[in-house]
């Protein structure tokens, strides 16, 4: 049985938000998700909002936004760098069965761009 290997660091252009340097990118076959850890460079800009980062990553990775969840964004005081951990699931159903409720809510819920009724 082979051990999943980490891919080499690569750069992801995130438009106005800056750019990300992927440090770890591997597929977890047990959970059926891709786990990405990256350094987000956003010099002279605020830390990006989760929903905007999630939308841009969905566009760049070519997957549905319902399959992507930002686990954390950690930014040092005054730094234009943030460490970001992202989970990209094979299906939205798997994401909902593994991600804690508070993470789903932090990421804008199940349908992040659906308007609230009422």
Swiss-Prot record:
Q: Which Pfam families match?
A: Ribosomal_S24e
**PROSITE patterns (UniProt xref):** RIBOSOMAL_S24E
Q: Name one GO molecular function term.
A: structural constituent of ribosome
Q: Which GO terms describe its biological process?
A: translation
| InterPro entries per the UniProt record, alphabetical | eRP_eS24_sf, Ribosomal_eS24, Ribosomal_eS24_CS, Ribosomal_uL23/eL15/eS24_sf
List the keywords (alphabetical). Answer: Ribonucleoprotein, Ribosomal protein
SUPFAM superfamilies recorded: Ribosomal proteins S24e, L23 and L15e (SSF54189)
- Family matches, as Gene3D superfamilies: 3.30.70.3370
A GO-annotated cellular component: ribosome
Name the protein family.
Belongs to the eukaryotic ribosomal protein eS24 family.
Task: Enumerate the PANTHER family for this protein.
Answer: 40S RIBOSOMAL PROTEIN S24 (PTHR10496)
Protein known as: Small ribosomal subunit protein eS24
Q: Which organism is it from?
A: Aeropyrum pernix (strain ATCC 700893 / DSM 11879 / JCM 9820 / NBRC 100138 / K1)
């Amino acid at each position: 049985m082979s051990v999943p290997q980490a891919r080499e660091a690569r750069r992801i252009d995130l438009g106005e938000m800056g750019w990300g340097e992927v440090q770890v990118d591997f597929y977890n076959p047990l959970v059926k998700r891709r786990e990405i850890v990256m350094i987000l460079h956003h010099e002279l800009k605020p830390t990006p909002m989760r929903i905007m980062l999630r939308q841009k990553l969905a566009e760049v990775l070519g997957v549905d936004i319902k399959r992507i969840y930002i686990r954390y964004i950690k930014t040092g005081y005054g730094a234009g760098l943030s460490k970001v951990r992202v989970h990209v699931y094979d299906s939205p159903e798997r994401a909902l069965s593994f991600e804690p409720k508070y993470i789903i809510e932090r990421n804008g819920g199940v349908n992040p761009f659906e308007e609230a009724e009422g």
